[in-house]
């Protein structure tokens, strides 16, 4: 059964280690735990951050992090990052994590969700299936 828990100081170390493993072993990254901790901690401590971790049967599958943005006429959410760890990809975990995120931010009054994505087939397939509109391309 999938469950969602807030990203906190109690679970950040596990998120950091899985993040480093994922990006360094599957995406040719050069992350250190120190750099990953700084990146994740920066986002999760932003005022109005909304970050949580997805679990299935007690196993961490992925996480999402971002923050609310207030405007004069609407409230938005900026999705800083969504990560589904490699062994859980292409099994619906990303879709259910996005569904949970969308439900949470809608309950909090969000009318607009925005993100920046890598322009590759894998990411474009995911965002297209979620009905995101493609805006600017560099």
Each language-model region and where it sits:
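Conserved beta-strand-loop-alpha-helix junction that forms the acyl-donor binding cleft
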Residues: 114-125
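Conserved GNAT-fold acetyl-CoA-binding loop/helix
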Residues: 9, 20-41
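Conserved beta-strand in the GNAT
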Residues: 53, 59-68, 76-78, 83
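A conserved beta-turn-beta hairpin within the catalytic core of GNAT-like acetyltransferases
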Residues: 69-79, 89, 111, 135
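A short helix-loop-beta-strand connector motif used in the catalytic cores of GNAT acetyltransferases and
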Residues: 41-53
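Conserved acetyl-CoA-binding loop of GNAT-fold acetyltransferases
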Residues: 127-137
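A short beta-loop-alpha structural element at the N-terminal edge
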Residues: 1-17
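Conserved acetyl-CoA-binding loop-helix of GNAT-fold acetyltransferases
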Residues: 84, 90-103, 129
């Amino acid at each position: 059964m999938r469950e969602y828990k807030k990203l906190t100081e109690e679970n950040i170390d596990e998120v950091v280690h899985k993040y480093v493993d994922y990006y360094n072993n599957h995406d040719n990254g050069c992350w250190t735990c120190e750099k990953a901790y700084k990146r994740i901690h920066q986002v999760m401590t932003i005022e109005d951050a909304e970050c949580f971790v997805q679990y299935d049967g007690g196993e961490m599958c992925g996480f999402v992090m971002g923050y609310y943005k207030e405007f004069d006429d609407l409230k938005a959410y900026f999705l800083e990052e969504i990560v589904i760890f490699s062994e859980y990809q292409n099994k619906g975990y990303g879709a259910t994590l996005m569904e949970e995120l969308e439900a949470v931010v809608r309950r909090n009054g969000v009318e607009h969700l925005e993100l920046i994505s890598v322009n590759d087939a894998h990411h474009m397939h995911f965002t297209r299936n979620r009905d995101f509109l493609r805006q600017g391309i560099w």
